[in-house]
Amino acid sequence: MGMRMMFTVFLLVVLATTVVSFTLDRASDGANAAADLVARGIRGNCCMFHTCPIDYSRFYCP
């Protein structure tokens, strides 16, 4: 296999990897939202006071 052919195969592999990665990333948008809520609850940094959505929105677990 010549250098030109190896370079072409390399470019095809990179292109295929990029396309697959991009497609999988778009398909998983928002899929981890429930897992994030569970992880925050397990870690114990949820704020359960009624003012938390206003004051500490990143720690609020609905």
Curated annotation (Swiss-Prot):
* Molecular function, one GO term: toxin activity
Answer yes or no on keyword Cytoplasm.
no
Sorted alphabetically, the Gene Ontology cellular component annotations on this record are: extracellular region
Signal peptide per UniProt: 1-21
Explain the post-translational modification: Both Pro-53 and Pro-62 are not in cis/trans isomerization.
Q: Which residues form the propeptide?
A: 22-40
Free-text domain note = The cysteine framework is I (CC-C-C). Alpha4/8 pattern.
Q: What is this protein called?
A: Conotoxin Pl168
Q: Which organism is it from?
A: Conus planorbis
